[in-house]
Amino acid sequence: MNPIAFNLGPLSIYWYSILIALAFGIGIILASYHAEQRGVNLDKFTNLVLLVIPAAIIGARLYYVIFNWGYYSANPLEIPAVWHGGLAVHGGILGGFLAGFWYIRRHKDLKLWMLADIIAPSLILGQAIGRWGNFFNQEAHGGPVSKEFISKFPDFIQKGMYIDGLYYHPTFLYESLWNLLVFFVLLYILKRKSLPNGIVTMTYLILYSVGRFFIESLRTDSLMFGPFRMAQVVSIAAIIFASAFIYFKLKKSKSIEK
């Protein structure tokens, strides 16, 4: 598996970079469409997106570097080399949210949770696309599997998951397909405009976290916090927080209707 798509002179263009760019591009188009449908000022929304994207990339990279500090402290020139892989989704969510929160606080006509709901389907779709970058880098896979097991997948998956004489769980594919399913669920909920703001976002957190928790248990490259897989710890916390948010938000909405 060659992670390089093509070369421009001395510059190598990686499939990982192409797929991340594609994920952001499609996500921006979709989110802008939903923003326009809901009467959001597109100039302000565009400015928000242009702030959130680099913040998300920086957050995703910093999160990954921090939990792999032993390697990066010895190889500091590798820290900005995101094209080699190493973007942590949870760090990206945190970085993007903090940047968006900062921007929205300075524009009182923008509503945080309404905008988060608009962005959530685009985010999970982008994650579904971006996971294929892991495939080309032959990373974020699970443990070894038998030839019989991997033969159930298409030939190109089998070839991509054949690494150093062994076949591996294509966990990138599991997560990509799960994220795609979550995307359609979020689109359905987003169309129900009677729901309070924030419900789509919290549904995203719950569904993504459920899938990530189970898929993470198969991976061999998990970021660790002591004996715990960090992604699973964050997933549990996200599920608890989002479930409580939805419960109290819907309860408040019903009391207002009465």
Please report, for each region that a protein language model flagged, where it lies by residue.
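A feature for loop-to-transmembrane-helix boundaries and adjacent hydrophobic helices
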Residues: 1-258
